[in-house]
UniProtKB/Swiss-Prot annotation:
Its main location: membrane. It is a multi-pass membrane protein. Belongs to the UPF0397 family. The keyword Cell cycle does not apply. InterPro entries: ECF_substrate-spec-like (IPR009825), UPF0397 (IPR022914). This is UPF0397 protein LGAS_1499.
């Protein structure tokens, strides 16, 4: 039996297209919060969709590449602590997404609740732990500033994924034929 090594072509394409769309969404759909360098981001529901459909490697890669490119193109420099936080967000959501059966048209209320519990935990890990601690260790940023940014990002990103991410996942599942729904006449 010939076992495939590495990423599938489908995953590589998803990473490339996903990262490009990530950069475009980050550039044109960010809504300022009033907290410096912290926005309401529409890109995170998109990342959650890709991570859930294609898995943790694609989620991590799209988050990492998309955020790194977006930072560089928009600001001329990359904030690696936030890039890593985004990648970890995609990874965790992708790991949970492996438990879902979206390709068979299934996304129940119980699964929606589970997805949102996991994405909120992933946002807390990413924005209240990885990003602020990274900012302190890498960039010597003041604690009060980075934890305020992290708390704001946690709340806004969790809410955007809760609302838009859930809608995207439900819409995606609705486009798939439910397993066993077709019968022979």
């Amino acid at each position: 039996m010939n076992k495939q090594k590495g990423l599938s072509v489908k995953s590589v394409v998803a990473i490339g297209i996903g990262a490009a769309i990530y950069v475009i969404l980050a550039r044109f759909t960010s809504i300022p919060t009033g907290i410096p360098n912290t926005n309401i981001e529409i890109v995170y529901p998109f990342l959650a969709l890709l991570a859930t459909i294609y898995g943790p490697v694609v989620g991590f890669s799209v988050g990492f590449i998309g955020h790194a490119l977006g930072d560089f193109l928009m600001y001329g420099q990359t904030w690696w602590s936030w890039v890593l936080a985004t990648a970890v967000l995609g990874l965790i959501i992708g790991l949970y997404g492996m438990r879902l059966d979206l390709d068979n048209g299934v996304f129940t209320v119980k699964q929606m609740v589970g997805f949102n519990v996991v994405q909120i935990i992933a946002n807390v890990i990413s924005w209240l732990l990885i990003a602020p601690v990274g900012d302190i260790l890498i960039y010597s940023e003041p604690q009060n500033k980075v934890f305020l940014q992290g708390a704001t990002a946690t709340i806004t990103n969790s809410l955007s994924i809760l609302i838009l991410g859930t809608i995207l996942l439900k819409a995606y599942a609705a486009t798939k034929v439910k397993k066993g729904s077709l019968r022979k006449d």
